[in-house]
Amino acid sequence: MARPRPREYKAGDLVFAKMKGYPHWPARIDELPEGAVKPPANKYPIFFFGTHETAFLGPKDLFPYKEYKDKFGKSNKRKGFNEGLWEIENNPGVKFTGYQAIQQQSSSETEGEGGNTADASSEEEGDRVEEDGKGKRKNEKAGSKRKKSYTSKKSSKQSRKSPGDEDDKDCKEEENKSSSEGGDAGNDTRNTTSDLQKTSEGT
């Protein structure tokens, strides 16, 4: 199907916006707040439903929502996409500040959990990184995963190191005991066998 001719959009228009690497996403043409940086020529400020992210896109990457709802409005497994479809239908006036309020609430919850032990808090911190990473774009998510694995490995190494040293000493001592006992046990077996032979020869 041929692309539609680029057209003029105004603030508040509902569209599907296409960015490289992402499906056609439910979005809204935003108005520029006073004092904001002006977008490049022929670019519109876009607010993406579901993720509440913003970008500047040209008219060739924008598709009117009503005309393309049947084509692009199918549910998708990408995080935030289905929420975006719901928002564009039920709450098209949602503002970016709503997302910031959610972030502030989650950061205050994080501060309130400071009384946990070191191991428990590091595990929970790793979970938080993963949850936060799901809402981010693909390249940012990879960085979060690295952080998570790095912190969890670091904490597990520290927790293994102190008890592990004692365990290693205990294991070595037990090995020495068992090897010396094993030698005696082997001698005992030989003695027992020779004793049996002597006994059988004597009878």
Swiss-Prot record:
Tissues expressed in: Detected in testis, heart, spinal cord and brain.
Keyword Nucleus: yes
GO biological process: microtubule polymerization; negative regulation of microtubule depolymerization; neuron projection development
Biased composition (Basic residues): 135-160
One Pfam family here: PWWP
Residues with PTM Phosphothreonine: T110
Residue ranges with Acidic residues bias: 121-130
One MF term in the entry's GO annotations: growth factor activity
Organism superkingdom: Eukaryota
SMART domains noted in UniProt: PWWP (SM00293)
PTM-bearing positions, type Phosphoserine: S121, S122, S162
Compositional bias of kind Basic and acidic residues: 169-178
InterPro entries attached to this UniProt entry: PWWP_dom (IPR000313)
Region (Disordered): 97-203
Protein family: Belongs to the HDGF family.
Protein task: Enhances DNA synthesis and may play a role in cell proliferation.
Name of this chain's protein: Hepatoma-derived growth factor-related protein 3
Gene transcribed to yield this protein: HDGFL3
